[in-house]
Swiss-Prot record:
Lineage of the organism: Eukaryota, Fungi, Dikarya, Ascomycota, Pezizomycotina
Organism: Aspergillus terreus (strain NIH 2624 / FGSC A1156)
Protein's name in the database: Epoxidase atD
Phenotype of the disrupted gene, per the record: Abolishes the production of terreic acid.
InterPro entries: RmlC-like_jellyroll, RmlC_Cupin_sf
Its biological purpose: Epoxidase; part of the gene cluster that mediates the biosynthesis of terreic acid, a quinone epoxide inhibitor of Bruton's tyrosine kinase. The first step of the pathway is the synthesis of 6-methylsalicylic acid (6-MSA) by the 6-methylsalicylic acid synthase atX. In the biosynthesis of 6-MSA, atX utilizes one acetyl-CoA and three malonyl-CoAs as its substrates and catalyzes a series of programmed reactions including Claisen condensation, reduction, aldol cyclization, and the hydrolytic cleavage that yields 6-MSA.
């Protein structure tokens, strides 16, 4: 199901790709495609999500290994939402929705179904679904800062992609940090009593508190379209507030930068030479010297003086 974990790096993650500003995002070479849609009233997001069984054509070796492994992305890992109800409506193929251990197969003929807050669930593409499975996902708007919304999905799918393809697995702390910021909590094992309680506080303590102290943050500029919203979310959390930089809001537009750059160049006295292109400056002086030399040569001929111009522009005069 793609939930391959590795030993935590104990250092902040740096994205490998940029996907901010895209209404449609594609991950894992098109194995997963998400199209963000306008959410209906009372819902925090809506998107059309498509999973494929495989990818055709020549593909990089790291993606090939992932597709052939048990960790091929075919749906999110088992999770629950503390505050939100999630909705599913299949458009194409067969989607399996598992809620509290009970699986239901959904097709385009089925009506939208819901999974209430607190239920442990997952969904994935059925093996018998032809080429792909497409489902419309949405969730209730709980009004809290950290919930399922576009900011969360852009960052989770961006990190999921980069971690599995380029880092060999998910950093446990980073994963819990992002999940906590999206009301997306990983339950404890099925045999564990109070698995939902433990799963929730594990995300909060490890992902939010310890992760925040170590410099982990849930959102990244490279993945996030509405960065102002993401910054507001992180500034509201005391554990991530210090990790947020907001000077970007005062960045000048390109036209403003051009206007500021049109001012006269400052002079630097004896430091000026090393802030110029010495090669080009030397060539310019040579060219000017040669031009001046030719002019004087013409003048010398007219006055009966033969003029020889050296390469450096200096003159030797001889009486004719």
């Amino acid at each position: 199901m793609g939930e391959l974990f590795k030993w935590p790096s104990f250092s902040p993650f740096v994205p490998f790709h940029v996907s901010a500003g895209q209404t449609v995002i594609r991950k894992f070479g098109g194995l997963l495609t998400c199209e963000f849609l306008p959410p209906p009233p009372g819902r925090s997001f809506m998107m059309r999500q498509t999973y494929r069984h495989s990818v055709e054509g020549p593909i990089p070796e790291n993606l090939r290994k992932l597709i052939e492994s048990d960790h091929r992305p075919d749906g999110p890992p088992m999770h629950f939402h503390q505050w939100q109800t999630e909705y599913f409506k299949v458009e194409e193929g067969i989607c399996v929705v598992e809620v509290n251990g009970k699986q239901t197969m959904l097709t385009p003929d089925d009506e939208e179904i819901s999974c209430k807050a607190g239920n442990i669930h997952r969904f994935f593409i059925h093996p018998d679904s032809r080429e792909r499975m497409t489902v419309i996902l949405s969730a209730s708007d709980s009004g809290v800062d950290y919930q399922l919304d576009r900011v969360f999905f852009e960052n989770w799918y961006g990190y999921w992609h980069d971690a599995l393809l380029y880092q060999g697995g998910l950093d446990f702390i980073q994963t819990l940090c992002i999940h906590d910021a999206g009301d997306h909590y990983t339950p404890g094992p099925a045999w564990l009593p109070f698995r939902r309680f433990i799963g929730y506080w594990m995300c909060v303590v490890i992902g939010r508190w310890i992760g925040g102290l170590l410099g982990y943050k849930p959102f990244f500029r490279e993945y996030t379209t509405d960065w102002d919203f993401a910054v507001t979310k992180m500034k509201a959390n005391p554990w991530t507030r210090r990790l947020v930089n907001d000077s970007y809001a005062n960045k000048k537009s390109w036209d403003e930068q051009v206007e500021l750059s049109s001012r006269p160049k400052a002079q630097n006295a004896d430091y000026e030479l090393l802030v110029t292109d010495i090669t080009e400056e030397n060539r310019r002086k040579k060219a000017n010297g040669a031009t001046n030399g030719h002019a004087k040569l013409a003048n010398g001929t007219a006055t009966g003086v033969a003029v020889e111009v050296k390469e450096n522009g200096e003159e030797l005069r001889k009486r004719s």
